[in-house]
Curated annotation (Swiss-Prot):
<keyword id="KW-0963">Cytoplasm</keyword>
<dbReference type="InterPro" id="IPR008832">
    <property type="entry name" value="SRP9"/>
</dbReference>
<dbReference type="InterPro" id="IPR039432">
    <property type="entry name" value="SRP9_dom"/>
</dbReference>
<protein>
    <recommendedName>
        <fullName>Signal recognition particle 9 kDa protein</fullName>
    </recommendedName>
</protein>
<dbReference type="GO" id="GO:0005829">
    <property type="term" value="C:cytosol"/>
</dbReference>
<dbReference type="GO" id="GO:0005786">
    <property type="term" value="C:signal recognition particle, endoplasmic reticulum targeting"/>
</dbReference>
<keyword id="KW-0694">RNA-binding</keyword>
<comment type="similarity">
    <text>Belongs to the SRP9 family.</text>
</comment>
<keyword id="KW-0687">Ribonucleoprotein</keyword>
<dbReference type="Pfam" id="PF05486">
    <property type="entry name" value="SRP9-21"/>
</dbReference>
<dbReference type="GO" id="GO:0006614">
    <property type="term" value="P:SRP-dependent cotranslational protein targeting to membrane"/>
</dbReference>
<dbReference type="InterPro" id="IPR039914">
    <property type="entry name" value="SRP9-like"/>
</dbReference>
<keyword id="KW-0733">Signal recognition particle</keyword>
<dbReference type="InterPro" id="IPR009018">
    <property type="entry name" value="Signal_recog_particle_SRP9/14"/>
</dbReference>
<comment type="subunit">
    <text>Heterodimer with SRP14; binds RNA as heterodimer. Component of a signal recognition particle complex that consists of a 7SL RNA molecule of 300 nucleotides and six protein subunits: SRP72, SRP68, SRP54, SRP19, SRP14 and SRP9.</text>
</comment>
<comment type="function">
    <text>Component of the signal recognition particle (SRP) complex, a ribonucleoprotein complex that mediates the cotranslational targeting of secretory and membrane proteins to the endoplasmic reticulum (ER). SRP9 together with SRP14 and the Alu portion of the SRP RNA, constitutes the elongation arrest domain of SRP. The complex of SRP9 and SRP14 is required for SRP RNA binding.</text>
</comment>
<dbReference type="GO" id="GO:0045900">
    <property type="term" value="P:negative regulation of translational elongation"/>
</dbReference>
Length: 86
């Protein structure tokens, strides 16, 4: 399990992991109210990337990362559906 200290390193590695095999990759968000920490984990069952934070400003970064991944998912699906219908 690779735990990253900086958001930039984590987001690059997580996007690369997703693009390597989109069908196996999954993202998990976990919030612990008791200590106010947020943990995001991206895994494909072989590699596990983790980023933990307790900073409120990182929530915006995580939200932006999620929307970026969703765009990648939708773009990939729309291309494959278009190829199937042709």
């Amino acid at each position: 399990m690779a735990q990253y200290q900086t958001w930039e390193e984590f987001s690059r590695a997580a996007e690369k992991l997703y693009l390597a095999d989109p069908m196996k990759a999954r993202v998990v968000l976990k919030y612990r109210h008791s200590d106010g920490s947020l943990c995001i984990k991206v895994t494909d069952d072989l590699v596990c990337l983790v980023y933990r934070t307790d900073q409120a400003q990182d929530v915006k970064k995580i939200e932006k990362f999620h929307s970026q991944l969703m765009r990648l998912m939708v773009a990939k699906e729309s291309r494959s559906v278009a190829m199937e219908t042709d």
